[in-house]
Amino acid sequence: MGFITKAIPLALAAASVINGAEIMETRAGVQTLADKYIVVMNDGMTDKDFDSHRSWVNRTHRRRLIRRGAKAMGGMKHTYRFPTGLKGYSGHFDEQMINEISKRADVKYIERDARVQINAIEQQDNVPSWGLARVGSKEPGGTTYYYDGTAGEGSTAYVIDTGTDIQHEEFEGRATWGANFVDDMDMDCNGHGTHVSGTIGGKTFGVAKKSNVVAVKVLDCNGSGSNSGVIMGMEWATKDAQQKGADKAVANMSLGGAFSQASNDAAAAIAQGGVFLAVAAGNDNVDAADSSPASEPSICTVAASTEQDGKADFSNFGQVVDVYAPGDSITSAKPGGGSQVLSGTSMATPHVAGLGAYLIGLGKGGGPGLCDTIKQMAIDVIQNPGASTTSKLINNGSGM
């Protein structure tokens, strides 16, 4: 499998309706987290009503523990308040408590929390990369990256991943630590996030060589995390970007899994907040319509191409794919210094996030509309892109 974060196979089947609230059902074989759920509130809920609902949940949960001798559950853990209005929470509840929550008229739906993890398909040190040259040229086989000297200056890229080695020489002091929603180690002990960050803003490997990089850690040293933790990272990035200027921000999510309405809604909230979001299509060689957050239409979904301008054999495809970008045997930074070669739609996606940052530096505007700009600039070269899939490969418009 490709080096993309993947929920082992988490797929949305039917949605059952219990007294007004949907409890999303998952197919057999899903690796859900025992007794852990994500609850999403109705659209337009006020902060006051949300606080009232949360108080009711906490009171009811405590009473259950005391009166009924219910087995110990952690109750509510994370609360989500996206600036665009999406509200919800996640926590550890037994079935009876979830049934009580589902009866509430202010609940939109409930989804089982699930595990996410990353899988590498190849790794080789110190091999020349080709992706940058391809982004800056209209013909394959080049060895030079042509780009404007602004190089994304003034833009900020939020890398929602395993963290970033912010001390790596590639970042020249432009990388900072943002937030951690998975463990107590503010470092990239996996390597995936540093590689992604290097492709966006590294001085050698980056598409936008002067952009700032912010590490948002949602996956641990084993590349494992949860949908609920990823959503926390998405919320934090949205709020931080809005405080600093969303029109100067891009976000990268080289992760995903099978369909999750909660993940899609959170991705849509990032876009609604004015931040350009690039997401990996997935590495299962299937239609990305069943993947999340890749299937969210308001974001920029990226498939992976080869050096010969073909579809990478692992890459997902389909109508939800917006563009192709180099994703096979890509060289970028690794924690502790130096570089490594990785493949996957995880590697394609930061080329697009980096191009978004690059265009911001050129004064082309920001926000989710950048995806349309990138598609307009793309070149029609991908061979055998897959059923109902674009054949457009990204290009930075340098004219070479």
Curated annotation (Swiss-Prot):
Residues 21-119 form a propeptide. Glycans are attached at residues 58, 222, 252, 396. The keyword Secreted applies. Residues 129-400 form the Peptidase S8 domain. Its EC number is 3.4.21.-. The active site is at 161 (charge relay system), 192 (charge relay system), 346 (charge relay system). Residues 1-20 form the signal peptide. This is Subtilisin-like protease 7. It is found in: Secreted. One of its GO terms (biological process) is proteolysis. GO terms for cellular component: extracellular region. Disulfide bonds: none annotated. Belongs to the peptidase S8 family. The lineage of its organism: Eukaryota, Fungi, Dikarya, Ascomycota, Pezizomycotina. Residues 36-118 form the Inhibitor I9 domain. It comes from the Eukaryota. Keywords: Glycoprotein, Hydrolase, Protease, Secreted, Serine protease, Signal, Virulence, Zymogen. The keyword Cytoplasm does not apply. Transmembrane segments: none annotated. The gene is SUB7. One of its GO terms (molecular function) is serine-type endopeptidase activity. It comes from Trichophyton verrucosum. Secreted subtilisin-like serine protease with keratinolytic activity that contributes to pathogenicity.
